[in-house]
């Protein structure tokens, strides 16, 4: 029977990040394929395609996009792997950012034809703040792509991280012949599409004269020159990888499965067991026998038939056991978690035990909030808070049918507690109308869809001009007396704090100039 340390040591928990359509969902499914978690890979190809394994919400199946973060666990070569699949659509939510807080490392998928794109930059920034290892998979090499050296240079320039090519592509598109593995000094030949089946590969050394016969003299010479050029660059540094300052780069084609298995094997070899987390009492030993976890995501109505609400927890230390009494630090209550579940998108499975590094979902009766800490009785430390990100888009929202006020309030509050939206109110006003703020505008569509389908409430939604929000730390006057510029408003959150919403950074100067005692703070909290 494995020891606690052995079980924890085989855990690998990582997030996959990318810009829309870079191939993230396809790569995720190929990982699951190798782990035996799915029998075949189903690629997302727009609205007519079958729904991908990691897309479970109805709106995701309709649109062929991921708008919530899925959690998937599978076994492979002795490792227990937890994948946090983040939305790839350009409009995403705070849920995406928070999911990255539960990961120990990240896989960054880049479209070989497009390079570094806007959402990649946003997600990378969150990973970089945590200094977690970031591995790069440059995808779609079976199509026409940009120069591979140019792509690596762009990653370094745009993202501020060094790169080291673990393998090197031989051509691209119709000329794509395979990749050269620099460490093993071998060539894996690309043999065309495999459509979800495990790929067969041929191997030949770089110095082998038969390489010229196989690739052609010109292509073989080009490969030898490029590999020699790479050899004159920086050395591989494992410590830099683990510090998040050097990204190992792999080339391949997720759609055809080429390069996916070698990438997964190298990724598992280079990553470490779950990392220790910081609490208000210092760093918590991941191998401690005492269970502890934090809530990073709340999702309501994953199963519409059950009207349930799940809190997703990242286990940070020790071993979780079903039906054992634990302690919810924020409320001071003891609780018994009798139906812990692991996920494969919307598919669930009750688990009897789980270890540090694992993600479990537990039924939430309304007790949990994002960032909460759960420990064994007698331990009262709290893990560092989960960031709150400033919303960039705002709408005034009210129910079309005033008789549905109760459902409206319940729905907006529950969806806000999940972190998909932030809700505010006009000071002194009731809850018949709220201001909704989001990070990405798609969340308005998701919010409207869920309110109608889960709470039976049709909404009246009016766009507002604000794109910034600041917390009022102090002021010399009553909020009603603040001198406002055009396109600014005083709001209140549900912790009764006052905030200023406004249009454009220039407004800060106006507001502070005309309100001498006004002190504004960034709403981001960690």
Model-found features: residue ranges?
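Structural and coupling elements of P-loop NTPases
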Residues: 1-526
């Amino acid at each position: 029977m494995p020891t606690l340390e052995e079980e924890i040591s085989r855990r690998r928990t990582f997030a996959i990040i990318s810009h829309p359509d870079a191939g993230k969902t396809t790569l995720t499914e190929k990982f699951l394929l190798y782990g035996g978690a799915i029998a075949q890979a189903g690629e997302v190809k727009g609205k007519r395609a079958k729904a991908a394994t990691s897309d479970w919400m109805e709106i995701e199946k309709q649109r062929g996009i991921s708008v919530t973060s899925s959690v998937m666990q599978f076994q492979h070569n002795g490792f227990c792997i937890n994948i946090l699949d983040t939305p790839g659509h350009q409009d995403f939510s705070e849920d995406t950012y928070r999911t990255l807080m539960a990961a120990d490392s990240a896989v960054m998928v880049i479209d070989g034809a497009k390079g570094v794109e806007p959402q990649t930059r946003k997600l990378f920034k969150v990973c970089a703040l945590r200094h977690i290892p970031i591995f790069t998979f440059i995808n779609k090499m079976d199509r026409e792509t940009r120069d591979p050296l140019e792509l690596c240079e762009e990653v370094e320039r745009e993202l501020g991280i060094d790169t080291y090519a673990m393998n090197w592509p031989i051509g691209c598109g119709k000329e794509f012949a395979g990749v050269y593995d620099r460490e093993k000094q071998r060539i894996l030949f690309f043999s065309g599409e495999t459509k979800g089946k495990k790929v067969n590969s041929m191997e030949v050394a770089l110095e082998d004269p038969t390489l010229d016969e196989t690739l052609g003299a010109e292509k073989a010479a080009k490969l030898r020159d490029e590999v020699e050029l790479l050899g004159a660059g920086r050395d591989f540094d494992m410590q830099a990888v683990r510090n998040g300052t050097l990204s190992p780069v792999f080339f391949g084609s997720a759609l055809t499965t080429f390069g996916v298995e070698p990438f997964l094997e190298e990724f598992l070899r280079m990553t470490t067991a779950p990392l220790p987390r910081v609490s208000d009492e210092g760093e918590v030993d991941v191998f401690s026998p005492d269970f502890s976890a934090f809530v990073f995501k709340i999702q309501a109505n994953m199963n519409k038939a059950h009207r349930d609400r799940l809190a997703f927890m990242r286990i940070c230390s020790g071993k979780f056991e079903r039906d054992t009494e634990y302690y919810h630090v924020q409320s001071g209550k003891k609780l018994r978690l009798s139906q812990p579940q692991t996920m494969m998108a919307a598919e669930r499975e009750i688990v009897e035990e789980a270890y540090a590094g694992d993600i479990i979902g537990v039924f939430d009766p309304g007790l949990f909030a994002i960032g909460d800490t759960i420990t064994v009785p007698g331990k009262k430390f709290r893990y560092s808070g989960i960031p709150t990100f400033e919303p960039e888009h705002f709408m005034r929202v009210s129910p079309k049918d005033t008789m549905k006020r109760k459902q409206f309030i319940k729905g907006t509050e529950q969806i806000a507690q999940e972190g998909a939206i932030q809700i505010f109110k006009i000071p002194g006003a009731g809850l018949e109308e709220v201001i909704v703020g989001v990070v990405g505008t798609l969340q308005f569509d998701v919010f409207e869809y869920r309110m109608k389908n889960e709470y039976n409430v049709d909404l009246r939604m009016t766009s507002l001009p604000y794109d910034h929000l600041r917390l009022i730390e102090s002021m010399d006057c009553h909020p009603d007396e603040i001198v406002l510029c055009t396109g600014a408003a005083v709001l209140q959150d549900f912790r009764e704090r006052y905030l200023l919403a406004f249009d454009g950074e220039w407004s800060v100067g106006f507001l502070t100039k005309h309100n001498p005692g006004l002190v504004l703070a960034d709403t981001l909290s960690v």
